[in-house]
Amino acid sequence: VELDYCGICPWDVRAFRGLASGIQYPRLLGHEAAGRVTRIGEAVRSVSVGQAVVVNFIVQCGTCPACRRGLMNVCQRPTYGRGGFAEAVTVPETNVFPFNPKTSPQAAAFTEPLSCVLRGERMLDIQPGETALVIGAGPIGLMHIQVARLFGARVLAADLRPERLEMARQMGAEVVINPGEQSLKDAVLAATDGWGADAAAVTVGSARLVEETLPTLARGGRMNIFAGIYPKEPVSLDPNLIHYRELRVLGSSDSTPADFRQALALIDQGQAQVLPLISHLLPLERLTEGMEIVKAAQGLKVMIDLHA
């Protein structure tokens, strides 16, 4: 696959800095990529040369207990292909997903992160008319807002940056909250007539935000810890609050092939607005600069143009 674009994920930055667990070096990073098929093996039947595709760089074994239970996203014996910060990669047929040639390859490159968002939001089991709270209005949070709305939720979004809160409004958040200016819990209760959020996605890797989000939940509420916390921090949650309100605390990690296909369909059909999330488009030789931009949380999505 000759690659056109590859987005930079915060995980790439952690791995680049040597902070991601389970990584063997040297390692070519990048896993949010789109391109075109240039060569195929003799046994390949599902794709053809010239076809526009997105790539899933994690190859699940398909035979471990997790895979056999349908939890391919947490495969116990995954292998990692060569990353997307490259001009071309070789991947198994099962790990490429064709997309509509009318779809921008920049938009298609959002398939992997959107597939993870879809999985997290699906685990929250949002019902039409419920209130969903999204903590963090970076690129991932902005996709959570859109998916929660697609599931029929009224969305509240919280972030410390006014420009990100404005983007959250543009993506469909009905209420935006700056926790630096007001109590998160009080703001959520005020926006829900004292009921609280039926579902919440914590898209920022912060123990404090996990702790502060739990009390915003309504009875029967669900919280998805979407982001890993690095360096690791202990989290203190009130077990009585979880017990008496029948709360559910959930984690989600990566995505399954089914999530991948659904995310790509949302992009192909224009139901997920991802192009407005690109704030920086850089050539490959400025990859290190792009990593620093993501590390500093400047702008939104930093994407590498592999032909610039």
Predicted regions and their residues:
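NAD(P)H dinucleotide-binding glycine-rich loop of Rossmann-like/cofactor-binding domains
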Residues: V59-I135
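Glycine-rich beta-strand-centered segment in the early N-terminal region that forms part
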Residues: V1-C6, L19-P65, N100-T103
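Glycine-rich cofactor phosphate-binding loops and adjacent beta1-alpha1 units
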Residues: L124, E166, M171-L247
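Residues in the short beta-alpha loop(s) of Rossmann-like NAD(P)-binding domains
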Residues: L19, R161, I229, S255
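Mid-domain Rossmann-like dinucleotide-binding core that forms the NAD(H)/NADP(H) cofactor-binding site
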Residues: T103-Q182
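C-terminal hydrophobic helical "lid"/dimerization subdomain
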Residues: E211-P215, P257-A308
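Glycine-centered, small-residue-biased loops immediately flanking beta-strands
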Residues: E130, G221-R222, L300
